[in-house]
């Protein structure tokens, strides 16, 4: 139902748009109005075209058309027949109205560029000084002198012995005093050791002859170590008995 109403509204809108375009194109006159008015036509030509009746068949919807969104239906409009198109009056083609000469489009006034001033004339170069008088002709060159003869090297002289100045006389020796032998201070001789008194007689005790107990790293002796082992085994047995009594 909604699709039918949308199609009817589209058909009515297209009919109204076509009638408006005909009305707008009918009374349009030529752009240039002539000074002489054309005589009115004797008989009005009947309209050659008639408005076609609205078709009831719905045009097929193309597959590419998107689904119409739900819109509110337009208000009900009674289908009215479009008005007959207005036809311009028939003008005889034999006598076209005179048209005034078409004037060219008014263009913006062209602004002529300012006249370019000619470049200043180059200043005349300063007058060159008067050329000096030509120099007198150079005298003719002297004749070439012969090459000098090779000079023989002077004879080598034997080296003369170098004379040394006389050595100065030795200074008189001073009388040296002989140092006396110094006595070295030696340590005094040690005092004599007095003889020690005789030692008392040694008494043999049977306890002294007994072997000493073997040392223990824990700070005790072998007897204490044996006693500790017995205590350890006793404690282990008591713990086992206690556990058996708890589980029974």
Swiss-Prot record:
Keyword Nucleotide-binding: no
Gene Ontology CC: plasma membrane; side of membrane
Signal peptide: 1-24
Main localization of the protein described in the UniProt heading: membrane
Compositionally biased tracts (Pro residues): 38-57, 67-86, 94-171, 189-203
Cysteine pairings via disulfide bonds: none
Lineage: Eukaryota, Viridiplantae, Streptophyta, Embryophyta, Tracheophyta
Compositionally skewed regions (Low complexity) per UniProt: 25-37
Propeptide: 197-248
Native organism: Arabidopsis thaliana (Mouse-ear cress)
Tissue localization of expression: Strongly expressed in stems, moderately expressed in flowers and roots and weakly expressed in young leaves.
Disordered: region residues: 25-221
PTMs per UniProt: O-glycosylated on the hydroxyproline residues.
Biased composition (Basic residues): 173-187
Keyword line: Cell membrane, Glycoprotein, GPI-anchor, Lipoprotein, Membrane, Proteoglycan, Signal
Topological relation to the membrane, as annotated: Lipid-anchor; GPI-anchor
Cellular localization per UniProt: Cell membrane
Lipidation (GPI-anchor amidated serine): 196
Protein name as it appears in the record: Lysine-rich arabinogalactan protein 19
Name of the gene this protein is made from: AGP19
Reported function: Proteoglycan that seems to be implicated in diverse developmental roles such as differentiation, cell-cell recognition, embryogenesis and programmed cell death.
Family: Belongs to the lysine-rich AGP family.
């Amino acid at each position: 139902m909604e699709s039918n109403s949308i199609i009817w509204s589209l058909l009515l809108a297209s009919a109204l748009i076509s009638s408006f375009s005909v009305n707008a194109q009918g009374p349009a006159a030529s752009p240039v109005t002539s000074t002489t008015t054309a005589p009115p036509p004797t008989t009005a030509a009947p309209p050659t075209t008639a408005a076609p009746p609205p078709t009831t068949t719905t045009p097929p919807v193309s597959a590419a058309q998107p689904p119409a969104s739900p819109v509110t239906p337009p208000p009900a409009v009674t289908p009215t027949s479009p008005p007959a198109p207005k036809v311009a009056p028939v003008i005889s083609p034999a006598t076209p109205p005179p048209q005034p000469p078409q004037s060219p489009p008014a263009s913006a006034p062209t602004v002529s560029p300012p006249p370019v001033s000619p470049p200043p004339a180059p200043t005349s170069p300063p007058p060159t000084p008067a050329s000096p008088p030509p120099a007198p002709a150079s005298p003719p060159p002297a004749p070439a002198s012969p090459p000098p003869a090779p000079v023989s090297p002077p004879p080598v002289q034997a080296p003369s012995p170098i004379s040394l100045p006389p050595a100065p006389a030795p200074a008189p020796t001073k009388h040296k005093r002989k140092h006396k032998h110094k006595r070295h201070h030696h340590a005094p001789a040690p005092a004599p050791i007095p003889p020690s008194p005789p030692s008392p007689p040694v008494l043999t005790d049977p306890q002294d002859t007994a072997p000493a107990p073997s040392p223990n790293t824990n700070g005790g002796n072998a007897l204490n170590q044996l006693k500790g082992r017995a205590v350890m085994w006793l404690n282990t047995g008591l713990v086992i008995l206690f556990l058996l009594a708890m589980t029974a």
